[in-house]
Design a protein with these regions (language model features):
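Short acidic capping loops at alpha-helix termini that bridge into adjacent secondary structure
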Residues: 35-36, 59-60, 88, 303-307, ...
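N-terminal glycine-rich phosphate-binding loop and ensuing alpha1 helix
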Residues: 1-43
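Conserved core of the PLP fold type I
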Residues: 282-341
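N-terminal "arm"/small-domain region of PLP-dependent enzymes with the aminotransferase-like
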Residues: 229-284
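Conserved core of the sugar-phosphate nucleotidyltransferase
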Residues: 100-184
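Acidic donor-binding segment of Leloir-type glycosyltransferases
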Residues: 36, 43-62
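Conserved alpha/beta core of the MobA/IspD/sugar-nucleotide pyrophosphorylase nucleotidyltransferase superfamily
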Residues: 155-243, 249-253
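Conserved beta-loop-beta/alpha segment of the NTase-like Rossmann-fold superfamily
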Residues: 56-128
Length: 341
């Protein structure tokens, strides 16, 4: 899904604002007293190994190779590293994540030994969700196919960072993982095993919700673009937001005080009417220019001949400026720069 960006390299070699994901991870993890870092490699694995050997000889890093990475999924990759999980307490992290330092601090400093980091659902999130109770017990893992928008307010997204104790791995997780692979095959996800464990009353795994800490999962070029904005330097972030000219729903925590909005529009009545007619609006083909001009004239009380309906102000501005002006023209200058651009 990342196309040319991963044509010759694995995902963790992607750069976000000039820093590779693997470099960021290793810098973050090197602050802690870890016995070792274990990396499961597959696609273009030797390039990653060579890069790490050349740059991180001072860190104890071991590698596990998945030679059939193109025929298996992450459940098999994790199974290959099962001996490491059973030998020590483990932090499990996926390589396509970018997180701020505080998230790892929060995980390691928590007194619970077995944790799954989760984040309250936001619209940009995709993939496996969970439900949790007031005691942070995971009640249910919800795969992507089982997602229900009407229940989204109850969901938390798995961040795909976990803390497993040696006891949990050896006595609960790995035995179930091995059995799951035998029954379901190797082209599955390791979270499905965690889903089975939630059915057991005595599992020690708990969820740990994060707060406003920044994180992002990079699966495609749009994710990379958004992550580059979120994790940019303070001095550059405003310009990166500004050049988007909108679409700020992709940044739920961003408050935009400059965009030309009317806090009284649309009102509740209009929202309810749109919701009630949504299926018709979505499935039916819209009317042409003639009908739209007629309706606009009707609602504004003017002749149809005096109305031109366009797809937003930018479309009409272009026509007016190029074809219907002579000499000097004076215009207002809105904050989102649609006239000069």
């Amino acid at each position: 899904r990342l196309g040319e960006l991963t044509k010759n390299n694995t995902k963790c070699m992607l750069e976000v604002n000039g820093v590779r994901l693997i470099d960021r991870y290793l810098r973050q993890l090197s602050k802690y007293s870890l016995d070792r870092i274990v990396i499961v490699v597959g696609y273009e694995g030797q390039k990653l190994i060579d890069y790490i050997h050349a740059n991180y000889s001072d860190i104890n890093i071991e590698f596990v190779n998945n030679p059939i990475y193109d025929k298996t999924n992450n459940i098999y990759s994790l199974a290959l590293a099962k001996d490491y999980l059973c030998a020590d307490d483990t932090i499990l992290m996926e390589s396509d994540l970018i997180v701020e330092d505080g998230i790892i601090d929060k995980l390691l400093n928590h007194t619970d030994k077995d944790l799954a980091l989760v984040a309250k659902y936001e619209q940009w999130m995709d993939g496996t969700m969970v439900r949790i109770d007031d005691n942070r017990r995971i009640l249910q893992f919800i795969p992507k196919a089982g997602f229900r928008y009407e229940e989204a307010d109850d969901y938390y997204k798995t961040v795909n960072i976990y803390k497993f104790s040696r006891e949990f791995s050896s006595k609960q997780y790995i035995p179930f993982l091995e059995a799951y692979c035998k029954v379901m095959g190797n082209n599955e996800y390791y979270e499905q095993v965690l889903s089975v464990l939630t059915l057991l009353q005595n599992t020690t795994l708990r969820a740990l919700p994060i707060g406003n800490e920044k994180w992002y999962e990079i699966d495609d070029v749009q994710d990379l673009d958004i992550a580059s904005t979120l994790f940019s330097e303070d001095k550059n972030r405003f310009q990166l937001y500004h050049k988007r000219y909108g679409g700020f729903w992709r940044f739920p925590k961003l408050l935009d005080f400059c965009y030309l909005v009317n806090p009284f529009f649309p009102n509740k009545r209009m929202r309810d009417e749109i919701r009630n007619n949504f299926d018709i609006l979505l499935e039916s083909y819209p009317s042409g220019m003639g009908v739209n001009s007629l309706l606009a004239g009707k609602y504004f009380g003017i002749k149809q001949d005096y109305v031109v309906v366009g797809n937003g102000a930018a479309e009409l501005i272009k026509v007016v400026m190029e074809e219907h002006t002579n000499g000097r023209v004076g215009v207002i200058f809105p904050t989102f720069d649609e006239y000069p651009n």
